[in-house]
Amino acid sequence: MKKILVIHNKYRETGGEDIAVSNEIKLLEQKFKVKVLYFDNNISNLFLQSFYFATNRNKKSINLLKQLIDDFNPDIVYVHNTWFKASLGIFELLKNKNIKVILKLHNFRYFCTKSYFSKNHVLVDNVCEACGYKGSKRILNKYFNNSIAKSLLISRYGVKYFQI
């Protein structure tokens, strides 16, 4: 029986993506041996979490995943949300372990990060077709939490996400 490791970073408030992941896990368990690695974005050390977020690598998450891979030895890793505690650093580990990866894109949040720092982020009607953001045609939009600094970090995350 094939083994699948599901990775999902839960949202602070349960929403559609979390429910979809839960439903898919139930479906997969009917045909495969499944383990689930959940992450959450509770912050215990603000400085350390900020560092992990800025570097797109969470050493604690990577080590947790490495241990689970060594114990479970999955054939496939099915990745849902990595924002932000799971981190993009998990993909380097998965590549080095030569494990097949399925990456599910639930929404287009990262697509719009490719452009939201430009005045082209919002079109003629001032609404981004990818995220629904309504704003002005400025050079820098405060897209994420009304903060240029946070917007810059998520933009960097989005660019790296599409390099995977």
State where each predicted segment sits:
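Catalytic cores of nucleotide-sugar-dependent glycosyltransferases that transfer UDP/GDP/TDP-activated
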Residues: M1-I164
